[in-house]
């Protein structure tokens, strides 16, 4: 259930072929790509890596206002690579909001989603490739307690029709979830262990649900917000989550290592509100990207541009090998691997 976002805002990053080989050698089987970079798509052929293919915000107007443009986009970036590239989702726009700096794009998100979906449907691929958009947590008006989660009143006219269309298209809503920003913005009320998945006990009791970590609480506030629209049941994909190693309050190597390790350990689990629905999650990001701003955005990578790992943990088979080694060195039975590593298939 774990993937990694492949951003390219750096002038010192490896080639696309090197990056895809790095994904494969580290058993990372899912990727989010923010635009249809042709070199990356070519490198992904026959890799077995499942893909979220992004539509940049700058392309939304053209796709929204002209169905032919959407058909051409799908032909060029989807059909030309399918099925050797396993495109699972198309994310039409990222973190667009009707309030704030991206408000101009908001008018185009739903019609762009509709036109891209219809272009995919015309090829009979709408069951294999789901069309959605990615939002951030600023669209949540109330998140505490999680069961009272709701979207902001001034975004409902924008978001409700999108959720309705996702319900019609049987597609999940993509949400970028960052406990780091919640913690760094309010360290007085949010403890670091709660943000890092290391709290030993329930921190927030919300009726029948108990929360030991902020990630689950934030995720369930989104689930509740969707439920509280009374539109219908729409699943959630966590399309970004990460922790920076430098550049801001609480942004340290150790905090990032602990958060990311625990996020990977969480793979295959649901949330208290939806325990039977494993949460598909994408870590932001593959590399530190030196052309991003502000400064903190430069430090989210799992890898350095040199392809050296920043943190000593792995995915899938790598994690199992590490646990077996630790078990043999310590002469203890490996009794917890089913919890740390739900199954090799769950990390595909």
Swiss-Prot record:
Transmembrane segments: none annotated. One of its GO terms (cellular component) is vacuole. PROSITE patterns: GLYCOSYL_HYDROL_F17 (PS00587). It comes from Phaseolus vulgaris (Kidney bean). This is Glucan endo-1,3-beta-glucosidase, basic isoform. SUPFAM superfamilies: (Trans)glycosidases. The keyword Membrane does not apply. The modification Pyrrolidone carboxylic acid is found at residue 1. It catalyses: Hydrolysis of (1->3)-beta-D-glucosidic linkages in (1->3)-beta-D-glucans. Keywords: Glycosidase, Hydrolase, Plant defense, Pyrrolidone carboxylic acid, Vacuole. Implicated in the defense of plants against pathogens. The active site is at 95 (proton donor), 240 (nucleophile). GO terms for biological process: carbohydrate metabolic process; defense response. Its EC number is 3.2.1.39. Pfam families: Glyco_hydro_17 (PF00332). It comes from the Eukaryota. It is an enzyme of class 3 (hydrolase). GO terms for molecular function: glucan endo-1,3-beta-D-glucosidase activity. Induction: By fungal elicitor. Belongs to the glycosyl hydrolase 17 family. Residues 317-348 form a propeptide. It is found in: Vacuole.
